[in-house]
Amino acid sequence: MSVTLHTNVGDIKVEVFCDATPRAAENFLGHCAAGTYNDVKWHRNIKSFMIQTGDPTGTGKGGQSIWGKPFADEIRSSLKFDRRGIVACANAGPDTNKSQFFITYAKQPHLDGKYTIIGKVIDGAEDGGTLDAMEAIPVDAKNRPTSEIRMTGVTVHANPIAIKAAGK
């Protein structure tokens, strides 16, 4: 299962871990399919660490899960922040996942066991790819990009949640 996040900087294709973290995957795919992420800013960008999005208000303080309330973490010991391009739920502490997510720019082992991993980048994390372009964008004192980065749309390549709902 994969989605392509289209941005004004380039595309990022993500493999979603539907079996390993089913609730987080359902929430992420639900937002992708509903257009929640369309025209949303990437509001936090920290070189060598990560870039964050998924807040429809663009402030980093908004967003909601598809169920209208935060959902529990799905921490899996088999999933680690062991490479560039790990996609995970952003949160404000344990069991506070909503619509926001982040993508790592490098290994971040200190995050292991603290954030639910949704998937990994399978296209766009290579040298000279979209993540490089995003990481190179200057930021202000609050790590907000000085040149706007926006999600222009999302392509869901095969949505098992929709297939299940359709009874197929």
UniProtKB/Swiss-Prot annotation:
One of its GO terms (cellular component) is catalytic step 2 spliceosome. It catalyses: [protein]-peptidylproline (omega=180) = [protein]-peptidylproline (omega=0). GO terms for molecular function: peptidyl-prolyl cis-trans isomerase activity. Keywords: Isomerase, Rotamase. Its EC number is 5.2.1.8. Residues 1-156 form the PPIase cyclophilin-type domain. GO terms for biological process: protein folding. It is an enzyme of class 5 (isomerase). Coiled coil: none annotated. InterPro entries: Cyclophilin-like_dom_sf, Cyclophilin-type_PPIase, Cyclophilin-type_PPIase_dom, Cyclophilin_A-like. Belongs to the cyclophilin-type PPIase family. PPIL3 subfamily. PPIases accelerate the folding of proteins. It catalyzes the cis-trans isomerization of proline imidic peptide bonds in oligopeptides. This is Peptidyl-prolyl cis-trans isomerase-like 3. It comes from Mycosarcoma maydis (Corn smut fungus).
